[in-house]
Amino acid sequence: MSVCLDNCCFNRPFDDQTLLIIRLETEAKLYVQERIREGEFELCWSFVLDYESAFNPFEEVCNRIMKWKTLACVDYDLSDEVSTKADDLMKLGLKQADASHFACAIYLGADYFLTTDKKILNKPITGIKVLNPIDFLRSYSCAE
């Protein structure tokens, strides 16, 4: 099973953990990462994560996120197909970076796109299952 995590998801452990929902999303995301390390899930990476990480003002956080690139089974760069698909996705109200990341995940054939961004979770995106890490684990546990 292949998963693509967006920048919000990768950054969740570095967010303020005061709210229970943030702590739960963090734990779920860390569980997914452990399954990636163990080879149970495959991590899909895209140029968008490289781009967004470059703007992270916290160097340590950026470095920790970028280490995950070495565990990715595939890394997708910008292409005409991705640009075209991203343009279509932007019509749903997605920002360019988010639309490009989704387009990459779809072209990579990722099974799931994981995000903690509520605005993205509420978009009618087709071609890939979009879940927050908690709901992903809930659906994954039910499928076992």
Regions found by a protein language model. Give the residues of each.
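A generic alpha-helix structural signal
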Residues: 33, 69, 86-87
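Anionic, Ser/Thr-rich low-complexity intrinsically disordered regions
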Residues: 41, 45, 49, 55-57, ...
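Active-site neighborhoods of divalent-metal-dependent phosphate/nucleic-acid chemistry enzymes
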Residues: 73-112, 116-118
